[in-house]
Design a protein with these regions (language model features):
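A short acidic/small-residue loop/turn micro-motif
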Residues: 170-172
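C-terminal motif of bacterial Sec signal peptides marking the signal peptidase cleavage site
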Residues: 17-19
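N-terminal "domain-start" segment that seeds a small globular fold
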Residues: 25-57
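Thioredoxin-like thiol-disulfide oxidoreductase module
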Residues: 89-91, 96-153, 157-163, 182-183
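Sec-dependent N-terminal signal peptides
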Residues: 4-14
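Short active-site neighborhood of thiol/selenol oxidoreductases, capturing the structured segment around
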Residues: 61-76
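C-type cytochrome heme c attachment motif
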Residues: 73-80, 153-155
Length: 185
């Protein structure tokens, strides 16, 4: 009887181990596939950026507050925020569910129409590489912090496109989530 039991254990144990291992591998594979499917097809795979031209129509149809994300070319902090904070799944969900998001180059030389006013850049960086000037829309909406302007800057507008608050500099993920939750109401 002992020999039979020993033989049974010796021959079935490898199958149990292989079977368990395959289940773990299959489970990991399924989770990876599921994450890929969600990422590629989901409303929450990235922030749904819109153009400034679309905002008035969108707000009339479905009123929400607006987030303007001002960046500039060559800004390492802007890049870091785009690659960390703005790809966080919770941040994406908070933004997509509660705000309209618009990304703007704060030093663009293009004219921007906003609330019936055309804003320009009086001294674009292309004309004078040493210029620290920013677009007039940026200057209109961004509050100076300690006497200066910082990149990136996040601006929150109400449903009438009036300034609620501007937040200078990079916003780390936990800080940005709190900011979004505080101004959702």
């Amino acid at each position: 009887m002992k020999q039979f039991f020993f033989t049974l254990v010796v021959f079935t144990l490898p199958f149990v181990v292989v079977s368990c291992n395959e289940n773990a591998t299959n489970q990991e594979l399924k989770e990876t596939e599921l994450k890929q499917i969600i990422k590629s097809n989901s409303y929450y795979s990235s922030i749904k950026w819109i153009s400034l031209d679309e905002i008035e129509m969108k707000i009339k149809k479905n009123p929400r507050k607006v987030i303007l994300f001002f960046t500039k070319k060559g800004c390492p902090y802007c890049k870091e925020m785009k690659e960390t904070t703005l790809v966080d799944p919770e941040v994406i969900k908070l933004v997509n569910d509660n705000y309209y998001a618009i990304a703007l180059d704060g030093k663009t030389k293009e004219a921007i129409n906003f609330k019936g006013v055309t804003y320009i850049n009086d001294a674009s960086i292309e004309e004078d590489p040493k210029s620290t000037w920013r677009h007039n829309l940026f200057a209109e909406l961004v509050e100076p912090y300690n006497g200066g302007y910082y990149w990136p800057t996040t601006v929150i507008l109400d449903t009438n496109l009036n300034l609620i608050k501007s937040f200078p500099g990079i916003q780390k993920t936990p800080q940005f989530k709190r900011l979004l939750m505080n101004y959702m109401r």
